């Protein structure tokens, strides 16, 4: 084991996780091929850079302090084959549409993080499954094995392919944004794709009209040349599940501090360990044991990180977890991604909020709602789906509970696609079980389609818009008195 440590994580090294118990760890049969693949990853350049990671840390600090809102979304399990122009653009446009709605409703900057350019690994409850009467290894994501039953052998070469597809995806994201895809002067050019619902289209049009009216006014007074109106930042994320992949992409790099002139040769540059595979990584619900490998790995990286918490999370685990992952209590360093289920959130979330917000970690975490994972169910034929009414209900309850607890729900974490899939039941289109087979294309969990995702964005926007009106009315009332 290497001996290098970071100032904020005593006794830590990129490989110190290997001394800890680990869950969801694949056993590669070909150790030589694994070593060859990881050695190649060590020589490849970073996919993301420290200055980008630091910018996200700053944005998430604002979210933790109630000054911004975090929108995170993308595929459940990203496939290598999703590295195509149309597929990437459809997800970018959907995140832009949702963030426009949130910007209008919450009246706060929106931080956008895609579940893309690296979301290739998935935890599984069983290492094997039965297909056509034959037992085969479970599909664990393209970074490990293939979906076709004949491709279920763990293949270390997929680690390098994952790097290549992540790099290509992010390269196109950067190019598309640099070419003006996110220009606020033309939000109708983003299109509503597959949305046909007149009421939803009208509501979106109203939002666009308000934004364009504001831009016309800014143009009149000569204040519309700010580059923030023509571009956005879109950060990448994935579950940091496969540590054999994350370790070789963890690099000791200079902190991008402000440079002085003339250069100060007396003070060596500050260095930190960055995971350069993505801007943001999270620990899943199945791997967040405090004394296990994933928490050990995550405690040493400078990236902002997330932790999934749900019904199986004891309240007593929260503060030890935060003290391990964020000993300096940096606001925005840790995002707590809550995923209880619509029938459990009311009984579990309040205690979790009170535990954190009554401690030394008050106003330091980002509270983010994942209304997807606690609401998965199987219907006839074993098809996995989610009811939009359950997803909507959990998000709605979470907003209400945070308001009652005087805490701030700073984000939502969604599995979604810009395609017209039929994977989640209900929503404005009223999808039922018979509709699931129309366009069910997910290789893992069911995703929201464009229409359903926009409905959730309007739910959050309307909540914060109403809250803003209430505060304004209260302010006026007090000023009169």
Curated annotation (Swiss-Prot):
User: PTM per UniProt?
Assistant: The N-terminus is blocked.
| Pfam families registered for this protein in UniProt | DAHP_synth_2
- Pathway recorded for this protein: Metabolic intermediate biosynthesis; chorismate biosynthesis; chorismate from D-erythrose 4-phosphate and phosphoenolpyruvate: step 1/7
Q: Can you supply a Gene Ontology BP term from the record?
A: aromatic amino acid family biosynthetic process
Q: Where is the signal peptide?
A: none
Keyword annotations for this protein, in alphabetical order, are: Amino-acid biosynthesis, Aromatic amino acid biosynthesis, Transferase
EC numbers: 2.5.1.54
The catalysed reaction is: D-erythrose 4-phosphate + phosphoenolpyruvate + H2O = 7-phospho-2-dehydro-3-deoxy-D-arabino-heptonate + phosphate
Q: Which InterPro entries match?
A: Aldolase_TIM (IPR013785), DAHP_synth_2 (IPR002480)
Tagged with keyword Cytoplasm: no
For this UniProt entry, the molecular function terms from Gene Ontology, in alphabetical order, are: 3-deoxy-7-phosphoheptulonate synthase activity
Q: Does the keyword Transferase apply?
A: yes
- Summarize the subunit comment: Homodimer.
User: What is this protein identified as?
Assistant: Phospho-2-dehydro-3-deoxyheptonate aldolase
Species of origin reads Neurospora crassa (strain ATCC 24698 / 74-OR23-1A / CBS 708.71 / DSM 1257 / FGSC 987)
